[in-house]
Amino acid sequence: MAHTVKIYDTCIGCTQCVRACPTDVLEMVPWDGCKAGQIASSPRTEDCVGCKRCETACPTDFLSIRVYLGAETTRSMGLAY
């Protein structure tokens, strides 16, 4: 089951995670609730391969993805889904 995950509090809107993703899972979307005015969102979680390049690219060390291979992939980016 896929779901959108948004990063609110510590996302600085740098887009490094978006550029690092080899499967184009992440995108920046407008968001008035953070300082940068945009946040990273993952509308295509079903395409995530669990490489963690986005996590490595994140300069605030906030982005975290846990991938459990099997029937369902579970992801956590620090906030509720």
From Swiss-Prot:
Binding-site list for [4Fe-4S] cluster 2: C21, C48, C51, C54
Annotated keywords: 4Fe-4S, Electron transport, Iron, Iron-sulfur, Membrane, Metal-binding, Oxidoreductase, Photosynthesis, Photosystem I, Repeat, Thylakoid, Transport
Primary residence: membrane
Cofactor binding, note field: Binds 2 [4Fe-4S] clusters. Cluster 2 is most probably the spectroscopically characterized electron acceptor FA and cluster 1 is most probably FB.
InterPro entries noted in UniProt: 4Fe4S_Fe-S-bd, 4Fe4S_Fe_S_CS, PSI_iron-sulfur_center, PSI_PsaC
Subcellular location: Cellular thylakoid membrane
E.C. code: 1.97.1.12
Any GO MF annotation of the entry: metal ion binding
Domain 4Fe-4S ferredoxin-type: 2-31, 37-68
Topological relation to the membrane, as annotated: Peripheral membrane protein
Reported cofactor(s): [4Fe-4S] cluster
NCBIfam families per UniProt: PS_I_psaC
Subunit structure: The cyanobacterial PSI reaction center is composed of one copy each of PsaA,B,C,D,E,F,I,J,K,L,M and X, and forms trimeric complexes.
UniProt-recorded name of the protein: Photosystem I iron-sulfur center
Organism: Thermosynechococcus vestitus (strain NIES-2133 / IAM M-273 / BP-1)
